[in-house]
Amino acid sequence: MIRIGMGQIEIVPGNPRKNRDTILQAIEYAKALRIDSLILPELALSGYLIGDAWDQPAFVNECVAMGETIIKATDNIAVIFGNVGLDPDKTNFDGRPRKFNAIFAAQNGELITPQEAPYPFIIKTLNPNYRFFNEARYFTPLPIVAQELHRPVEELLGLLPFTFKNGETFNVAPLLCEDSWDENYSFSPTTTLADKSAIQNVPIHAFINISASPFTLGKNERRHRLFTERARALKTPVFYINSVGLQNNGKSICTFDGQSTVYNRFGEIVTQLPAYESIVQPVLLDKLKPVANDDSCAMYGIADLKDGHPTVKPAVEVPVPSEPAQIYHALHYGLQSFLKQTGIKKIVIGVSGGIDSALNAALYATVLD
């Protein structure tokens, strides 16, 4: 039986040292829970919406250095986290040192990488470039690396192979946020990983998607539909890990709502973490009992412990708050976080009697002590 930790942490944008400390605390807590592998969000050290801080070499180097301290802290545990990957010998389109939005995986102080990977980290394949997502401005995607190496991008994707203290092997198919939202792209990282697994006869025990996904009304329901379909089609559990917090790129201020979720191999939700809460939650996986004519039963299922014995974890009904409730929760959390980040303790509102000022006054009345 394997214990996977859902590391839904609050990330402070532009503060790698504070985020490093948060991650180290999460790792120590995970060790106390006897978790085998802790999964953390995308760009967990830097934050996601940080604007042109990516153009500052000192900031990027600090993110890399803080990542190295995380790697060193992985004695007796595996940790998967998002950070910036750096290749100082090459340049981005803007002439600055080449950066990647990347997944790092470490165990017992050493990096774990797919044998196909051209770097000691996993590069994001699909970089979004719409609305306030502007990754193409700062990061080089995997297809560009494949083109430079004169290799198909499929060859550079692979699994993270872990071996835990009980001798169990556990193969993870790693994806970064947009890599799962591939319906409008010509290439599907998810399908590629699944096809390679089948061809090479190497099982995928879980798909993971680490994300920095801002709150958008209705997005959680769309996400559930996406990952339910993927888990059911692939007959494999899916772990979606998102961050919480407030981030600001200078133009847009976004709340990150978490709601990290685990889907079993039937696409059913078995765990969903609360919105806007920082939490490390263990999830048990147990090998499925063999069933005739079902090759997938060489895999793992989501489990509960009952009287010390693993049982199948049942699906849960996830209540969907009303749209006004979701909007209010996002506004309340966002205002509270913004005041905390800026140190503002008092608000002056010119109340005109109109709906705008009245709504603001009502909102701040619920936020201010």
Model-derived regions, located:
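Conserved G/P- and acidic residue-centered "switch" motifs that form tight phosphate/ATP-binding loops
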Residues: 354
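Enzyme catalytic cores with a strong preference for nitrogen-chemistry domains
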Residues: 1-350, 358-369
